[in-house]
Structure formats: structure tokens, C-alpha cells
């Protein structure tokens, strides 16, 4: 990310930074906008069973998406609404269902509505899913299983507040 910010092409891009929050995860979001397609990097704490008190420590998850601007509407001179969707990849160290913590890796996808204001502020509401594998320990052995939470928790909405530089 540092190389992208200091390169000539990186400086020509619009950069957006913000906070993302949901019942499933909370973290930071970095978005690089160039033309019609954007890229997004998320670094989040996975909050599975943290909010309900069953787990005291969150997991960590990093996701990268290519965002395609599918539609855009102008509400007035100050506000635009964009619909974005796209594929990506995710990796981290999280819990899956009632299993212990383990490494997760997989393909991911996202869709969101972005409310963009001329002041540089934007508010996004969307969803993301992960189709991947999870490693865990069962009876002292390491197992590789389908990552259930990536699909089960895809319906949980995510809200983010961002500032454009």
C-alpha cells in the first residue's frame, strides 16, 4: 500500500479512508479510486461471539476487493449514490461456528450503496461474503473445513463512514 501511495500513479488516484462497522466485524477501510473501477483494502477485527460475551478476543481478517461501479444516481448538486459490487480475496485468523480459531482463506465478494457528498464524506451500506476454507484443531488434529461463517454471516449489513482525500 505504501508503494501505491508514493508512486506517480498512486498520487493521481483519489484515496478514501474510513471506518467499517457491523455486528460481524469492525475495522478500517482504504479505497483507491481510479476511473470506473476501484480497489479496496479492509483490515478488520472479526467479532464472532465477542459481542454476546462467549469469546473475549476478536480474530483478524484482511480483505481486498476490486469494486465495479455498476450504477450511479445524482440526488442533487451535493449528493450522489453509487452501487458498487465486485470480487476479492480474504485471509485471516478467525473462529468458525463453535470451532476454535484457525486460519481462513478464500474468495470474497461485496456489494454496497455509497452515498457520496461533495464535502469529501461518504457513507456506505453493504454486504460481503467469503467462500473459503478454515483450519482448526479437532481432537488434537488439524482439520481443513469449509468456512461456514463466510456464508452464514453474509446477510449482516455493514456500514462505513469514509473521507476522500
Where are these regions (language model features)?
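Solvent-exposed loop and beta-edge segments used for protein-protein assembly and interaction
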Residues: 22, 35, 79, 151-153
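Sec/Tat signal peptide C-region and signal peptidase I cleavage site
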Residues: 6-12
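Acidic-residue sensor for enzyme active/binding pockets
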Residues: 16, 40, 158
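Gram-negative (and chloroplast) outer-membrane scaffold detector with strong preference
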Residues: 31-121, 161-163
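Bacterial N-terminal signal peptides
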Residues: 1-4
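Predominantly the C-terminal beta-signal and adjacent terminal strand-loop region
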Residues: 118-165
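Short N-terminal segments immediately surrounding and downstream of signal-peptide cleavage
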Residues: 14-28
